A protein has these predicted regions:
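C-terminal helix-rich "cap/oligomerization" subdomain common to oxidoreductases
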Residues: 1-3, 31, 77-79, 227, ...
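Contiguous beta-strand/loop segments that form the cofactor/metal-binding neighborhood of enzyme cores
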Residues: 1-3, 193-264, 282, 294-301, ...
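Hydrophobic residues in well-ordered beta-strands that form the structural core
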Residues: 11, 103, 128-130, 257
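Rossmann-fold dehydrogenase core element
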Residues: 116-134, 154-160
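Predominantly a Rossmann-like dinucleotide-binding segment in NAD(P)-dependent oxidoreductases
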Residues: 134-206
Length: 340
């Protein structure tokens, strides 16, 4: 693909996260939303109008069929912004059609589906990436560079939380067993990805938690052990408020990621006897633009995976979440057919 080529995007799903990400396309050079799809043509039409109004661009095609949008020749990459169980069939259909995919986190509702999606992308040599936007934020990139350069010595552990108090509504996707609701897939994915990126895949996981009345996981505390006796202690909740802070411990110092850690703009690097070094780097837009830019750059360069968010990292997180959910007694399922 030409290094200056315009990338045509299709958006599968018109709900909360699709609307949140939409405005950040204004910060992505050479990206065009060519099509949107929902199971309802009314919702697709409304969202297509919103795209045009928000971005000041031509109105994208509106589809009431995900298969039709995937087949649209103006679409190069599909952003899968549907509930977790629907990621599998939409992503697989797109991959089999040769279309790249950016799959909203969590990558899938189960580790088995995540593995199937990754294997399909590799077999078809099609780009696939989980939408873990935190990894691409400028200040997070600076944090990783600092760790890799030895700013705090050898990292030894991670400690943090992500609490987001929500009113229980069994009709809402966030709380629905059928739609992959629950704290682990919604918030835990951030905390686990943060720890796994720094320390690798855990060798042991101990999890305890609570549930909503319908059995969906509401809270969890996790103790993870990693190679070389490194560890992480993490807490997540949909029933309590909390700061959303992360710290990285090292042999020569520590890093504080100020709340909220999954979309920070400021980190502090502490070393004994030294004034903390502050990194304060804002993101473009709401912060989603950086992952969208990464996808476009990968496609223009002919890459099938992102070096910043490789599929193996998504699979490590998926396996760890599966372990946690098993300990909490929660069983998720992925859809097998395209939503209709």
């Amino acid at each position: 693909m030409d290094t200056t080529a315009t990338i045509g995007w299709g958006i599968a799903g018109t709900g909360r996260i699709a609307r949140t990400v939409l405005d950040d396309f204004a910060h992505v050079p050479g990206a065009r939303i060519s099509a949107v799809a929902s199971r309802s043509i009314a919702r697709a039409d409304t969202f297509a109008d919103l795209v045009s109004q928000s971005l000041g661009t031509p109105r994208p095609n509106a589809h009431d069929s995900y298969a039709e949008m995937i087949a649209n020749p103006a679409v190069d990459v599909i952003y899968v912004a549907t509930p977790h169980p629907q990621h599998r069939p939409i992503a697989l259909a797109a991959i089999e059609a040769g279309k790249a995919v950016l799959v909203e986190k969590s990558f899938a509702a189960t580790a088995e589906a995540a593995t199937e999606m990754a294997e399909a992308a590799r077999a078809h040599e099609v780009f696939a990436m989980e939408g873990m936007w935190t990894r691409f934020l400028p200040v997070v990139t600076e944090m990783i560079d600092a760790v890799n350069s030895g700013a705090i010595g050898e990292p030894t552990g991670v400690q943090g939380d992500l609490f987001a108090l929500r009113d229980y509504d069994p009709e809402d996707r966030l709380f629905s067993p059928a739609l992959g609701g629950g704290v682990t897939l919604d918030l835990g994915v951030y905390a686990l990805d943060f720890a796994i990126r720094l320390l690798g895949e855990p060798t042991e996981v101990i999890a305890r938690g609570k549930h909503f009345p319908n059995g969906v996981d509401s809270d969890a505390s996790m103790l993870l052990t990693f190679p070389k006796d490194k560890f992480a202690t993490l807490a997540i909740s949909l029933t309590s408020d909390g700061p959303g802070r992360m710290t990285i411990q090292g042999t020569d110092g520590w890093i504080e990621v100020e709340p909220r850690f999954h979309h920070p703009s400021r980190i502090l690097i502490h070393r004994r006897g030294v004034i903390p070094k502050v990194h304060n780097t804002p993101a473009l837009g709401r912060g989603y633009a950086h992952e969208l830019i990464e996808v476009c750059e990968c496609l223009r360069a002919g890459r099938t995976e992102s070096q910043t968010m490789p599929l193996d990292a998504s699979l490590a997180v998926a396996r760890t979440m599966a372990n946690i959910l098993d300990q909490l007694g929660v069983e998720n399922h992925d859809d097998t057919e395209l939503p209709s």
